Regions:
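Nucleic-acid 5′ end/cap handling module spanning
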Residues: 1-75, 79-88
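Acidic, low-complexity intrinsically disordered tails
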Residues: 92-100
Length: 100
């Protein structure tokens, strides 16, 4: 099954040594606050633009699709950022934070 969710964008980093100009998103897990990495969809210029303009996206909410939650930390895996949501709160509630 394909699952989806909304995740806070913590950072946008280079994809790796083979494609350092392409972006990879660092996201906060919606169920426990752990972090995970997720590749964006899009053509080469879109994926480069996320990295070049990362300050415009950090703190926003990403909508991502993924295949499963993996490991002890239950982070989404085998997923992609589908789009950036502009009309969402800039911070999602974290289930681990105590209410004051």
């Amino acid at each position: 099954p394909i699952l989806d969710g909304k995740f806070e964008i913590l950072d946008i980093i280079p994809e790796g040594a083979k494609r350092p100009n392409f972006s990879k998103f660092v996201l906060r897990n919606d169920i426990n606050g752990e972090t995970f990495e997720c590749m964006p969809v899009g053509d080469a210029s879109t994926r480069q633009s996320y990295l070049i303009n990362k300050d415009k996206f950090i703190g926003k909410i990403a909508f991502a699709e993924f295949r499963c939650r993996s490991g002890v930390k239950e982070v989404p895996s085998h997923g992609n950022v589908i789009k950036i949501l502009d009309n969402e709160p800039t911070r999602l509630p974290n289930n681990n934070e105590e209410e004051s």
